[in-house]
Amino acid sequence: VKLILLVSCAHALVHLLEQSVASVEQVISDEFSFSMDQSGLLGTALRLPYGIGAFFAGLLADRFGEKRILVLYLFGAALVSMSFMVAGGSSVVYTQMFALGVFASMYHPAGLALLANETRPEERSRALGMHGVLGSLGIASAPFIAGLMLSLRPGDWRGYYLLLGIISATLGVLVWLLLKPAGHGAPERNSPMHGDDSVKNVYPTDLKFQIFPFTLLVLGTALSGTVYGGVLHFLPRYLKESGSMSHLESWLGTSIPDSAIGNYAAALALICGAFGQWLAGRLAKPGTLPRMLSLAYALNVPCLIWMTFAEGSYRLLAACLWAFVHFMNQPLYNSLVPEFLPRHRRSVGFGFSNMMGFGVGAVGPPLVALFDDRFADYTISYSALAGLAFVAALLPLPLMSIRFVTREHHHNR
């Protein structure tokens, strides 16, 4: 439980860092006079290394151990976040965002492999559901913390990053001192119970890499990652533009500062993602994972279409529903991936997967910016994202047939 909690807290933080730029992009854009296109590229500056770096981080985790990579990610992110206090021109900010993405990229291959290696298939979805809930809370906390800080100190996005740096450093110390995994490559190589049939049943040693199902899953997460990146980067802006919090302001009898209102609305929407992850983790069983993953992708389509024409408070409702169904895919996907990977290669497998999901997903923000600048609304961009989600929903379906794949939970029967 302690291991799951520590790793899940590191997961919450990585998504807080990932979503940090979207939470303050309007303030940064105002300071440096960025256009919407330039703001989209600012998101890409963080998301591209965040995705591509995951593959190389997976190689390092397989070589040096997951715990060392987690500690490096936390202390590196702390250093870069604190460096924003001395940020100068716009080119420096792009460089700092790139560096932050590099260190943040280290989390998923190390953290997910650690959890996959410490759990059995039948309990993995529930553990990853908890892991996903904290990740969603991390995403939601980014705009919430930004909104709170910008309410108290308007325009102070640097102080926001200083706070994130302090949180990163503190968690780095806790992981360094308290995280006690079974050991890299354990238990089938290092356990004193090596050779015990029960251990072999839990940790099969002859599970082979299966390229066909892995490729289908990775293509699906690349498409879903584009949807994720495109919606999240401009979510505070999308919700702010329509007065989505007007009913809440009327109920409270007070106005929310203009610099914070989009962030508070985005935080409310993204909290719904945590409930989606929890529900998916609770309902998932090894035999239902492909079907549920396909459904989670497919449910993005009507939500995104609703978001294209929703106005006022309905934008917030549409965004809440989208977040709920979109984030359901994460515990399902992360439970399926290790079933097609040998245990000693799960870090690099998750690394490549996240490279595709977040790396290809880095085109999402400039894609949305391109269409919105040209057509002055979200109709074309969100409709295009809905099309990508539909294609993603088709890809897990072949995994339902044992004629095409041999899954870990079949192997252990």
Q: For each predicted feature, which ranges?
A:
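Residue-level signature of mid-helix packing/kink "hotspots" within the transmembrane helices
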Residues: 19, 47-55, 140, 270-278, ...
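Extracytoplasmic gate region of multi-pass secondary transporters
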Residues: 21-22, 213-270
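Conserved MFS/SLC helix-loop-helix module at the cytosolic interface between two early adjacent transmembrane helices
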Residues: 52-88
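Paired small-residue
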Residues: 91-99, 314-321
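Cytoplasmic helix-loop-helix junction between adjacent transmembrane helices
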Residues: 96-135
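Helix-loop-helix hairpin linking two adjacent transmembrane segments in secondary transporters
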Residues: 131-183
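C-terminal transmembrane helical hairpin of 12-TM major facilitator-type secondary transporters
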Residues: 288-333
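A late C-terminal transmembrane helix in Major Facilitator Superfamily
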Residues: 345-374
